UniProtKB/Swiss-Prot annotation:
Entry-linked SMART domains: WD40 (SM00320)
Region (Disordered) residue spans: 172-192, 372-408
Domain of life, per lineage: Eukaryota
Keyword line: Nucleus, Repeat, WD repeat
Keyword check for Disulfide bond: no
InterPro entries named in the record: WD40/YVTN_repeat-like_dom_sf (IPR015943), WD40_repeat_dom_sf (IPR036322), WD40_rpt (IPR001680), WDR55_POC1 (IPR050505)
Ranges: WD repeats: 4-45, 66-105, 108-147, 180-220, 224-263, 268-308, 351-390
Organism: Malassezia globosa (strain ATCC MYA-4612 / CBS 7966)
Chief localization: nucleus
Protein name: WD repeat-containing protein JIP5
Any one annotated GO CC term: nucleolus
Gene3D superfamilies assigned to the protein according to its UniProt record, in alphabetical order: YVTN repeat-like/Quinoprotein amine dehydrogenase
Annotated localization: Nucleus, Nucleolus
Biased composition (Basic residues): 392-404
Length: 419
């Protein structure tokens, strides 16, 4: 199902409550829109007149424009009581999900436009910007009036835009090279003690691990991967990290082996991997700049097929809630895809009494799945795994999108006009 938007979308976020079927979208026009897709889960005859007469399985709850600059990120907090948004004018704004009114504002939160926002818990929120600065905030303490926003802490170890952030409630400590008893005891104590960490990927080709309790010294930065790191997800209950790159290679990281360098690599995508979502503990969904959403199995590595297609337009963002995946590309629509056929019963916490939603099923995309994972026809005899193309350095899709490799750039140049 496609949700029609008033302009091109840059980010999307599901309401965290399982009983609330709402999704927020940040637009290039500066608008933030909230949609209710609950009609997909109920008989159409029980729906309000608006959704029944329109023939749509969704309705727009509200639309606001807190800034005239593009909204580059949206994210609900864990309780769903706040919708945090970042804008090109360098501000952070908290909206009330009930009606969209502004609850709090952090003006001039960054020196350059923020590119990512991640609410961690009610007392902590992280943002990253186009210059590679990561900042931590207390959402409960916005500045008064038009006062300049002051972060709890600021990190400047990255030199290029922040592409993605992942919060790990526990990250395994690296294994000691010395197998003596003292090291084993120390590692055991570390494993028993919560090691929450913020994992950050950047366009400068490095991955960093931030201990928010460790001050400036609580930062570890990987070696230069000689490729832009664009997205990140965790599998194996946090034992492995998957990172998408500009060259289309998935780099695999093992925290217990240290995060100074990747532990494995899996080529196979003909274009950059701009978005990642965990499907289960062995499988991820990848959103690529060729417009395809692929299912990728890891350990052993295998491209399983395609579950979505944005018509050749790059996929900017993917978010998952239960058996639904929301994806946005370079267009004025948000696609909702039903993943229920891919998920075994009991893998996803959903209401058993609810019928299957009337969204695009994987079976409806049989003509896509029949193609190999790189988008070619299987009858051609080509392997699912392709070698990555020659390295080409791209600039950020948010602030430096001018050099990003997409199809028919000239025809879609207006997408980047207000970024």
């Amino acid at each position: 199902m496609d949700i029609a938007l008033s302009s091109d979308a840059l980010d999307v976020s599901f309401h965290p409550d399982e009983g609330v079927h709402q999704i927020a979208v940040g637009l290039i026009s500066g608008k933030v829109q909230l949609f209710d897709y609950g009609a997909m889960f109920h008989n159409q005859s029980t729906q309000p007149d608006e959704s029944r007469t329109s023939g749509k399985a969704y309705r727009r709850v509200w639309s606001v424009r807190p800034s005239h600059k593009s909204c580059r990120g949206v994210a609900f907090d864990a309780s769903g009581s706040n919708l945090f948004c970042i804008f090109k004018d360098k501000s952070i704004i908290a909206l009330d999900p009930s009606d969209g009114h502004v609850k709090a504002r952090w003006p001039r939160a960054h020196e350059s436009a923020p590119s990512r926002i991640l609410p961690i818990h009610e007392g902590l929120m992280a943002t990253g910007d186009d210059d590679g600065i990561v900042r931590l905030w207390d959402p409960r303490c916005p500045p008064e009036g038009d006062a300049e926003a002051k972060p709890l802490r600021s990190y400047d170890h990255h030199s290029d835009w922040i592409t993605d952030m992942l919060w790990c409630t526990h990250l395994d400590p690296p294994r000691s090279k010395k197998k003596d008893q003292e090291d084993d005891l120390k590692r055991k104590r570390d494993e028993e003690r919560a090691r929450s960490r913020l994992i950050v990927t950047s366009g400068d080709g490095t991955l960093s691990v931030i201990d928010i309790h460790g001050g400036k010294k609580g930062v570890e930065v990987s070696e230069d991967q000689e490729d832009e790191l664009l997205s990140i997800a965790s599998i194996k209950n946090g034992k492995k990290l998957v990172v998408g790159t500009q060259l289309g290679v998935l780099s695999l990281w093992a925290p217990d082996r240290g995060l100074l360098d990747h532990a494995d690599r899996f080529p196979g995508h003909p274009s950059s991997v701009d978005a990642l979502c965990t499907l289960d503990q062995d499988t991820v969904l990848t959103g690529s700049s060729d417009g395809l959403i692929r299912v990728v199995q890891l350990f052993p590595h295998k491209l399983l097929g395609i579950v979505g297609d944005h018509g050749g337009m790059p996929i900017e963002c993917m978010k998952r809630k239960g058996h639904l995946i929301a994806s946005i590309g370079h267009g004025n629509e948000c696609k909702l895809t039903d993943l229920a056929p891919l998920l075994e019963e009991g893998d996803v916490e959903t209401d058993a009494a609810e019928p299957e939603p009337a969204v695009m099923l994987v079976s409806d995309e049989a003509h896509l799945i029949a193609r190999s994972a790189d988008g070619s026809d299987e009858s051609a005899g080509e392997s699912d795994v392709m070698q990555p193309p020659p390295a080409t350095k791209r600039r950020t899709a948010k602030s430096k999108a001018g050099k990003k490799s997409v199809h028919d750039v000239d025809q879609h140049a207006s997408f980047f006009a207000d970024l």
